[in-house]
C-alpha cells in the first residue's frame, strides 16, 4: 500500500513538473512572437529606396512628443571589421530626418580602435558632416581623402536594400527578456542564402564564409516607446582575435525643435 502511495505521489509530481515545463515553453514562444511583432513595426519600412519618403512616414508617438511635433527619424548603418593582428575598423553613417523642417543632416564616420604596446586600448574617430538633398548624400566640407569621398558617394543605408519579409519564417530563436529594464532580444542563425546576407556580402568585403547570426535587440515597452531603441545586428565572426559584424537601426524620436 505504501509503495502504491509513493508511486501515486511520484506520478502526481511528475505531471505537475511536466505541466510547468509546458507552461514555460508557451510563455517563451509567446515572448518570441511579441518581440517579432514589436520589431515588425520597424522592419516594415525595409526596403525604402528613397530616404526622403521618411518625411511622410509616421512613427510611434507617445507622451514624449510635444503638440505639433512631427518628430524625426534617426537612421544608422555601420560595418565593423577586426581581422587577426589588425585594428578594429568601423565605418558607417547616421542621418537625422526632421519631419517638421523636412531637412536632413548627419555624418559619415570612420572609427579605429587600437591597442598600444602596453595593452592600452584607445579609439580614433573621424566624422565627416553630410546632408541629404533629392535623396543624395552631400558632404558639407571639402574632403582630401579620395577613398573616404568615394565611400560617402557610394554609401547606401541598409534600409534602402534590406528586406525582412521572411521574418515570420525565422524559428527557434534564443530569446531574452528583462521586464525591469526593460530589454529584450531574439537571435537567429541565418544561412548564406538568406537575402539580407547576400546583400551585405555584395556591398562589403566580408572575408569569412561563415553564415551570420541575426540579433534583434530592443529596449522600452514591447508595444512601442519613443525613448527606447531597436537595433539589428548581423554577426559573422565574434571572438578574441577577430570580429566581423554589421549593425543597423531606425528610430523615431521627438525632434526637440518644438
Swiss-Prot record:
Residues 1-20 form the signal peptide. Keywords: Cell membrane, Lipoprotein, Membrane, Palmitate, Signal. GO terms for cellular component: plasma membrane. It is a lipid-anchor. A lipid is attached at residue 21 (S-diacylglycerol cysteine). Pfam families: DUF576. Its main location: membrane. The keyword Lipoprotein applies. It is found in: Cell membrane. A lipid is attached at residue 21 (N-palmitoyl cysteine). It comes from the Bacteria. Belongs to the staphylococcal tandem lipoprotein family. This is Uncharacterized lipoprotein SAUSA300_0416. The lineage of its organism: Bacteria, Bacillati, Bacillota, Bacilli, Bacillales.
